[in-house]
Amino acid sequence: MTPEEVIEFLEDKLGREAEEVIVAEGFDRAFLGASLEPPRAIYSIELCIDALTNQGLSTSEAEDQFWGSVATIAEDHENAPIFIHTLT
């Protein structure tokens, strides 16, 4: 998905509550969907790590970057992204 498609999906599914959702910028291809209560974007951990390796990081570096920076995006915020393991 493109960033615009992610936003469009969230607006279509969540309506006004889409404005509250925190998205993980740069990980649009890892976007899977949304939760309703509370409204949150859902991403694949594996696809996020793949996106980082596609930027030139080794798998180890990508995993460190993901768990150290990406997965902690606004982690104390009710509308922070959800990251789940997916089968690949």
Which residue stretches match the model-derived regions?
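C-terminal alpha-helical interaction appendages
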Residues: 1-88
